Structure formats: structure tokens, C-alpha cells
Amino acid sequence: MKVAIGIGSAYYNGDDWNELVDYTVAADTMGVDYVWSAEAWGMDAVVPLAYLAAKTQHIKLGTGIMQISSRVPPMIAMTAQSLRTVSNNRFVLGLGVSGPQVVEGLHGASFAQPLAR
């Protein structure tokens, strides 16, 4: 059985970053398999994982999800490659279309035909 924890806007309100880091480091030490970083309103999915890659040894670091509406494909590929490198191959790329509230409300883009990008 795989065990995972989640961080990001759905799980974290930004009050104490050090507490979240300690939580993830403890999870890594206890053998938790994955940490998934979400994005919506607030923190993005990528920056926390880059920081946590330097603080952890074994836990896999995944985006759950990285929104395709706010990034062009080459930037997604470059970001994934960078995270793969700094995490010693522990990065897992999760992509998604998000929803109209975030895509239109936060990013100002149309949500119509989100996979046509």
C-alpha cells in the first residue's frame, strides 16, 4: 500500500511554512511514499516541491495538479525536468485542467475547451 500526504492551497493556508516543512520531513523519515502539492488560490504547486526536495531524501514529490491553463507546454516540460533534477528523480508530474473558477477568475483565461490548448 502506498501512503501519501497533501500540501498546497487545499491543505495549507500559508500561516506557518516551517510547520509544513517539518511535517513533510517527518513523513519522509517515517517512510511516507508521496507528497502531493496542489494549486488553486494562493500557492502554486511547484515552488514548495523544489524547497522540499532539498529537505527530504526519499519521499516522491508530485504535482496534484499543475494547471495547464496557466503554463505553456515548453515551460511545463522545463519545470518538470528541473524538479526531476533537483529531487534526484523523485518528481512525479500531475497535470490537469483545473476549473472555471480558477482558470477564469484567477488567471483571466477562458475555460472553454480546456484540453484544446
Located regions from the model:
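Short amphipathic alpha-helical segments at helix-loop
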Residues: 33, 64, 102-106
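N-terminal beta1-alpha1-beta2 module of alpha/beta enzyme domains
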Residues: 1-61
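Glycine-rich loops and low-complexity Gly/Arg-rich segments
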Residues: 29-32, 59-63, 85-89, 117
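Generic secondary-structure boundary/loop-capping signal
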Residues: 56-58, 62-65, 108, 112
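Flexible, glycine-rich active-site loops centered on histidine and acidic residues
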Residues: 2-16, 70-117
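Structured beta->alpha junctions
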Residues: 41, 65-68, 72
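Structural motif
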Residues: 37-38, 64, 94-96
